[in-house]
Amino acid sequence: MSKSTAEIRQAFLDFFHSKGHQVVASSSLVPNNDPTLLFTNAGMNQFKDVFLGLDKRNYSRATTSQRCVRAGGKHNDLENVGYTARHHTFFEMLGNFSFGDYFKHDAIQFAWELLTGENWFALPKERLWVTVYETDDETYEIWEKEVGIPRERIIRIGDNKGAPYASDNFWQMGDTGPCGPCTEIFYDHGDHIWGGPPGSPEEDGDRYIEIWNIVFMQFNRQADGTMEPLPKPSVDTGMGLERIAAVLQHVNSNYDIDLFRTLIEAVAKVTGATDLGNKSLRVIADHIRSCAFLVADGVLPSNENRGYVLRRIIRRAVRHGNMLGAKETFFYKLVGPLIEVMGSAGEELKRQQAQVEQVLKTEEEQFARTLERGLALLDEELAKLQGDTLDGETAFRLYDTYGFPVDLTADVCRERNIKVDEVGFEAAMEEQRRRAREASGFGADYNAMIRVDSASEFKGYDHLELNGKVTALFVDGKAVEAINAGQEAVVVLDQTPFYAESGGQVGDKGELKGAGFTFAVDDTQKYGQAIGHIGKLSAGALKVGDAVQADVDEARRARIRLNHSATHLMHAALRQVLGTHVAQKGSLVSDKVLRFDFSHNEAMKPSEIRQVEDLVNAQIRRNLPIETNIMDLDAAKAKGAMALFGEKYDERVRVLSMGDFSTELCGGTHASRTGDIGLFRIISESGTAAGIRRIEAVTGEGAMATVHAQSDRLNDIAHLLKGDSQNLGDKVRAVLERTRQLEKELQQLKDQAAAQESANLSSKAVDLNGVKLLVSELAGIEPKMLRTMVDDLKNQLVSTVIVLATVVEGKVSLIAGVSKDVTDRVKAGELIGMVAQQVGGKGGGRPDMAQAGGTDAAALPAALASVQGWVSAKLQ
């Protein structure tokens, strides 16, 4: 009879306790020693300072069953949960740890004894495979010579795309922190399940499943990527309880283990569902674990950070309950069954059961009030959707009005093969996200933490010079009374002509001057109702209360004004040319360029770009007056003024009009007349996300500089082609036609050379038990020609095994071909994998044809020499 999940957990802890390990309780899901982590996501999190040598324990060996959550940040599994066999928001990580005590030898021996020992897990040894980091020869030898695993079941895994330490077998908790090479143990479910061993093209299948990762902690990765040796080499291992339970209980999905079967039955009972195979049951069974334990560890639903992740998970579960037909609140009713199935690991949850149930019930009730209306709105929007992408505005409205996290909306859409414009959603959420970052301190910079009680009056519409008084000073985010020469600071004035970054327009630059001091302003930002001048005091001293003369960089402001006015003209022109579906999704207005993101489902045609340019320049030539009026928001909208989605407006708004061509709400600075812009020129059009296009353009002197540069390039090309700009098109077409002809002739010559080379090679084949074996390294042959040559040789040699290789710029290209009558004994994929491994690469393919690459050209001769022996053994 197989062990229950609770028994497996206890057996793991008992085994390592018998090996001198201290059994340490699971730490909270909220890390208390690592501000870089949203949630505890690995067993070693609570020991991070021990690995770094910053904390001392009265034991050097430890074992745990650690509660973990992966539903936000780098390790985000949420969208896959319920749809795959092994993704979870919550899981338990079984682990054993050595803090400068034992290292590779003992760690591997312990793992092998627990997995295969008759008194423990008793797994068949022949079902276990292992991987090691490519250069970790010591670990390889322990597995081969001491444990006795055959070489063919020990796989070296190198760096991804040559990036140092970017490997599945070089473990790191995050971008910084403890790390080191690791060895992973895989269980082979058998050939009745599709999939290949790790490192093979079929490795994503379900046949070979990773069950244990043993990390040899040797380094501390710094922010700049350097590796510093840890004080003492240590060991950190992790084995997912749910995965090993699936193996020991002889099931292929984690959701089929006893723990999840019990929870799924409980979910079916409280929702009234009858089909126990419904994926929504799996989603809810997973989500009750993460939600209940997060609440028990002090996380409450909110719109910020950890609380928002919890809210997302709860609401995803409630929505799946709705899909199952649940007519009343159900989610909180699963806490009791969860406590029962968790056994000893649920004791803390049991103590807080009433509170956890109340929190979950309240959140579910709040969401249930808007869920049906939100789903109805979403159904309505999807029904009239023209393309395959839901716009960000609708996604934001679902969030803002009905409490739909965007990934819940994405879940609904994914079931109908529809994407969500998350860029548009993020644009609408930007202000809320900024406030959340400031409040949490996660990644906040010093200036973002500034709080100013006073307000600044902006007078920059009419003045570029103004006298003001210093009302506050900040250095590194902290309020100070004075600053001295050389210090960087934020200066707040009672009134200022400096425009603070807003609505896409960059902040002004300039100077603050006074008695004996000069402060160079590099940027201007808003801090609540205050305007902060960011820069450096270049001379003198400055203190709160000082009088200053504020001088805006006039030439820079003038260029910004032209670009901002041109942005409005372009917005209106885009709506005329492309349609009224065009809506602003983001913008940047600087002194050098204007950038405009807008909703549109396809790339603009050259003719459309020209139309927009022509329309804007026509309005510039009309020299329309640019007028501003202050009016009520409702009146402005009634007048047809366009408001930007995501922007928050006061009841009284500033309406900017350019004749009858453009009317928008805008607080930015602008030209006096459209003619001031001079010239408008689009320099690029591109896509930034699904349904979002981006235009970059220049105006005035910048536009003239672009025209001159293009003219110069055309003249240079004409000179190279020995023509002039008038007949440049004909010259280029002639060159391209000649190039195509030469390329065609060259390819014909290459084909002839390859055919001749194939004919020459066929005579070099050797006979192995009636099968022709041909192995050759070819010089001067393009990699793509190898496949053609293999096809030719297979036709010539009939029953054959072929391996060809070439080296181009130090990179090895390999191909193996096997005639179909031989594939029952020799498979091209296995053969090419054996050769590729020796030259620092990997590859795969079909039984009759496989390709690979490698980086170690020096090892190629020896690798090719090994083919005959390998093939001979297969043909025996």
UniProtKB/Swiss-Prot annotation:
Job of this protein: Catalyzes the attachment of alanine to tRNA(Ala) in a two-step reaction: alanine is first activated by ATP to form Ala-AMP and then transferred to the acceptor end of tRNA(Ala). Also edits incorrectly charged Ser-tRNA(Ala) and Gly-tRNA(Ala) via its editing domain.
Organism domain of life: Bacteria
Keywords for this protein: Aminoacyl-tRNA synthetase, ATP-binding, Cytoplasm, Ligase, Metal-binding, Nucleotide-binding, Protein biosynthesis, RNA-binding, tRNA-binding, Zinc
Cofactor note: Binds 1 zinc ion per subunit.
UniProt-listed Enzyme Commission number(s): 6.1.1.7
Primary localisation category: cytoplasm
Cofactor(s) needed: Zn(2+)
GO MF entry, a single one: ATP binding
NCBIfam families given in the database record: alaS (TIGR00344)
Keyword Transferase (UniProt): no
Similarity comment: family membership: Belongs to the class-II aminoacyl-tRNA synthetase family.
Keyword Aminoacyl-tRNA synthetase set for record: yes
Reaction catalysis annotation: tRNA(Ala) + L-alanine + ATP = L-alanyl-tRNA(Ala) + AMP + diphosphate
Residue positions binding Zn(2+): H564, H568, C666, H670
Coiled coil: none
Protein's UniProt name: Alanine--tRNA ligase
Subcellular location: Cytoplasm
Subunit structure: Homotetramer.
HAMAP family, sorted: Ala_tRNA_synth_B
Assigned GO CC terms: cytosol
Organism: Salmonella paratyphi A (strain ATCC 9150 / SARB42)
Notes on the domains: Consists of three domains; the N-terminal catalytic domain, the editing domain and the C-terminal C-Ala domain. The editing domain removes incorrectly charged amino acids, while the C-Ala domain, along with tRNA(Ala), serves as a bridge to cooperatively bring together the editing and aminoacylation centers thus stimulating deacylation of misacylated tRNAs.
GO terms of biological process kind: alanyl-tRNA aminoacylation; negative regulation of DNA-templated transcription
Signal peptide region: none
Gene3D superfamilies in the record: 2.40.30.130, 3.10.310.40, 3.30.54.20, 6.10.250.550, Bira Bifunctional Protein, Domain 2 (3.30.930.10), Threonyl-trna Synthetase, Chain A, domain 2 (3.30.980.10)
